[in-house]
């Protein structure tokens, strides 16, 4: 058994008590647990690997261990990485609510308050900027791996796991991994992708926080692409240099020409839009087709939408991507 140290404390599985199963994530079963040394609650993720017989690739263990260095108030802390009998357990700090569950608690008539929408989006961008500056891409961001607490903080979970372990097509329960937040370059088979994939996901989540409805609800890769095209128009080389060279681009794609994005935010009942001009301008920057032109997390933190945000109570304060000497 190997345990990888955090704060010089060598943890083994015996240091944690499993309390109850709380879900099945992309990578396996998640349990609520207790750290026997500190009595703190933890989330224990038992990673299911495709090749159970061979055990855990050492590259995955090394890669995941590096994630313990990602210490930021808006990133769910990885407290220990434990290998036992060819099983890999990741021990994270425990938060009881994810963004999806939180939004599901809002009544039919109720929307996320505009200050909360702004605060959550800013905090997500702060975490993303911190990780991107350290060359860590999330690649599988969705409301289910954004965790919230009662103090108004939001934290990103599962950072870097996509690269370390790979994203399975189906979850543990054979439920298909959601495509609703996946960037068009990934959907069209790009072999190399950049931090822009996360910015696209943030755009989709930002829109969903405003309307309570997923923006692009596809049930297959091609359905997902066509739903994007129907709202934003089918991309051409003109707005996305290199799109026609992507492996899964087809010249026969239907040519939707109009952009209907703004219509998605019109609330018939009140006659108002669910996003103001600044918010919509940020969203447009996040949903630019060409990943090279899509807004970066650092630029997004300086967008006029956030000019009036009160950062005094935020976990990471007014951090807007300034590099800190560590």
From Swiss-Prot:
Enzyme class: transferase
Gene3D superfamilies: Phosphorylase Kinase, domain 1, Transferase(Phosphotransferase) domain 1
Location in or out of the cell: Nucleus; Cytoplasm, Cytoskeleton, Microtubule organizing center, Centrosome
Catalytic residues (UniProt): 140
Catalytic activity: L-seryl-[protein] + ATP = O-phospho-L-seryl-[protein] + ADP + H(+); L-threonyl-[protein] + ATP = O-phospho-L-threonyl-[protein] + ADP + H(+); [DNA-directed RNA polymerase] + ATP = phospho-[DNA-directed RNA polymerase] + ADP + H(+)
InterPro entries for this protein: CDK, Kinase-like_dom_sf, Prot_kinase_dom, Protein_kinase_ATP_BS, Ser/Thr_kinase_AS
GO molecular-function term, one example from the UniProt record: ATP binding
Keyword Transit peptide attached: no
Major localization class: nucleus
BP-aspect Gene Ontology terms: cell division; G2/M transition of mitotic cell cycle; mitotic G2 DNA damage checkpoint signaling; positive regulation of meiotic cell cycle
Pfam families: Pkinase (PF00069)
Residue ranges of domain Protein kinase in the record: 16-306
EC number: 2.7.11.22, 2.7.11.23
Keywords per UniProt: ATP-binding, Cell cycle, Cell division, Cytoplasm, Cytoskeleton, Kinase, Mitosis, Nucleotide-binding, Nucleus, Phosphoprotein, Serine/threonine-protein kinase, Transferase
Cellular-component GO terms for this entry: centrosome; cytoplasm; nucleus
PROSITE patterns: PROTEIN_KINASE_ATP, PROTEIN_KINASE_DOM, PROTEIN_KINASE_ST
Known regulation of activity: Phosphorylation both activates and inactivates the enzyme depending on the site of phosphorylation.
Top-level taxon in the UniProt lineage: Eukaryota
Positions bound to ATP: 22-30, 45
Family: Belongs to the protein kinase superfamily. CMGC Ser/Thr protein kinase family. CDC2/CDKX subfamily.
Subunit description: Forms a stable but non-covalent complex with a regulatory subunit and with a cyclin. Interacts with cks-1.
Function: Plays a key role in the control of the eukaryotic cell cycle. Required for entry into S-phase and mitosis. Acts as a component of the kinase complex that phosphorylates the repetitive C-terminus of RNA polymerase II. May function in concert with npp-16 to arrest prophase blastomeres in response to anoxia.
Protein name: Cyclin-dependent kinase 1
């Amino acid at each position: 058994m190997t345990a990888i140290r955090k704060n010089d404390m060598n943890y083994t599985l015996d240091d944690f008590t499993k309390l109850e199963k709380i879900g099945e994530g992309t990578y396996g079963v998640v349990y609520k647990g207790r750290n026997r040394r500190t009595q703190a609650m933890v989330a224990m993720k038992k990673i299911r690997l495709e090749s159970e017989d061979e055990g855990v690739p050492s590259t995955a263990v090394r890669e995941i261990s590096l994630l313990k260095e990602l210490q930021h108030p808006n990133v769910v802390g990885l407290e220990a990485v434990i290998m036992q009998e060819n099983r890999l357990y990741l021990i994270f700090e425990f938060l009881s609510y994810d963004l999806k569950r939180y939004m599901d608690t809002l009544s039919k008539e109720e929307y996320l308050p505009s200050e909360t929408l702004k605060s959550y989006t800013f905090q997500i961008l702060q975490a993303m900027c911190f990780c991107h500056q350290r060359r860590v891409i999330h690649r599988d961001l969705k409301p289910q791996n954004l965790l919230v607490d009662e103090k108004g903080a939001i934290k990103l979970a599962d950072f870097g796991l996509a690269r370390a372990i790979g994203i399975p097509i189906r979850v543990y329960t054979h439920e298909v991994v959601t495509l609703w937040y996946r960037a068009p370059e990934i959907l069209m088979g790009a072999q190399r992708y950049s931090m822009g994939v996360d910015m696209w996901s943030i755009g989709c989540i930002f829109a969903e926080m405003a309307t309570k409805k997923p923006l692009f609800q596809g049930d297959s890769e091609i359905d997902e692409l066509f739903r994007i095209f129907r709202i934003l128009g089918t991309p051409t080389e003109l707005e996305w240099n290199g799109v026609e060279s992507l492996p899964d681009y087809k010249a026969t794609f239907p040519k939707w020409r109009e952009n209907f994005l703004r219509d998605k935010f019109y609330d018939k009942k009140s006659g108002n839009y669910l996003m103001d001009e600044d918010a919509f301008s940020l969203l447009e920057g996040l949903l630019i087709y060409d990943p090279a032109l899509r807004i970066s997390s650092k630029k997004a933190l300086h967008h006029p939408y956030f000019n009036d945000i009160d950062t005094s109570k935020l976990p990471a304060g007014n951090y807007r991507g300034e590099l800190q000497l560590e």
